[in-house]
Amino acid sequence: MLKILSPAKVNLHLRVLRKREDNYHDLATLMQKVSLYDELEFQPSNRGIQLRCPGFFLPENEENIVFRAAKKILSFSGCPTGVTITLRKNIPLAAGLGGGSSNAAMTLLALNKLFRLNFSTGELMKIGATLGADVPFFLFHGPAWAYGIGDRLKAALDVPKVWFVLINPGFEVSTRVIYEKLNLGLTKEIIHYSIPRFLSMEDMAAGLHNDLESVTLKMHPSLQEIKDLLCSYGAAGALMSGSGPTVFGIFENEDKAKEAETVLGKPGTWAVFCVRSID
């Protein structure tokens, strides 16, 4: 058996540069993994691919990206074996934290190791890109700028390690719906975009930006209230991650983050997590 942790991510900066003719959008986004994890277990089996998601009403077939990831890498490798996968969720669903993409990436990584398939990291990233635009990022070491539809990665050097308080308000948001409502016309020309610096806590606070907030916060005004609350309890800045609805605040040390987590977690209506940057 092989056990592996599957981390969440936050978007420290997200600009939607243009809508493409294929209806996808070109992005520039800075992604950072954080220490909130789902747990995955893999057990070799002779009964094909079996997926279990105890405690959650999640599909346990090809509708689940974990199942598809397992099927794809075993098919690519020609390996005739099967595997039983157990997924224990801690990352909120449809929350802008990349839980599904992370689960798929860790499935590729785990099965490559478990069955000694000998795919390189680059090859795993190519397989991952066929499953979802964010999947390659979770196979990439450290924070990264992602371009295109999010699948072209460049290492983000010298991004400071910080603490985060994540607040998930308990409802789900459809990424597809948010992009459909984004007021961005079809743009054919290439957009030239200047990347902000993220070399210090001050840089990070100044660089926090998410174009998708213009849609999600209009649909759910309570998210702005959460951002304001985080700042009032010591966050240097606050932002919605991805298409939402999770909002995070950045803190310079663990003590300040823990204090905010304690206070903001008391009402019990939100899921509140104190986490740190990881590579």
Curated annotation (Swiss-Prot):
One of the GO biological process terms: isopentenyl diphosphate biosynthetic process, methylerythritol 4-phosphate pathway
E.C. number(s) listed in UniProt: 2.7.1.148
MF-aspect GO terms: 4-(cytidine 5'-diphospho)-2-C-methyl-D-erythritol kinase activity; ATP binding
Keyword Kinase recorded: yes
Pathway(s) of this molecule: Isoprenoid biosynthesis; isopentenyl diphosphate biosynthesis via DXP pathway; isopentenyl diphosphate from 1-deoxy-D-xylulose 5-phosphate: step 3/6
Disulphide bridges, residue numbers: none
Binding-site positions, ATP: P92, L93, A94, A95, G96, L97, G98, G99, G100, S101, S102
Domain of life: Bacteria
InterPro entries on file: GHMP_kinase_C_dom (IPR013750), GHMP_kinase_C_sf (IPR036554), GHMP_kinase_N_dom (IPR006204), IspE (IPR004424), Ribosomal_Su5_D2-typ_SF (IPR020568), Ribsml_uS5_D2-typ_fold_subgr (IPR014721)
Record field: catalytic activity: 4-CDP-2-C-methyl-D-erythritol + ATP = 4-CDP-2-C-methyl-D-erythritol 2-phosphate + ADP + H(+)
EC supergroup of this enzyme: transferase
Active site residues of this protein: K9, D134
Keyword field: ATP-binding, Isoprene biosynthesis, Kinase, Nucleotide-binding, Transferase
Primary role: Catalyzes the phosphorylation of the position 2 hydroxy group of 4-diphosphocytidyl-2C-methyl-D-erythritol.
Family per similarity comment: Belongs to the GHMP kinase family. IspE subfamily.
Protein name: 4-diphosphocytidyl-2-C-methyl-D-erythritol kinase
Name of the gene encoding the protein in the UniProt record: ispE
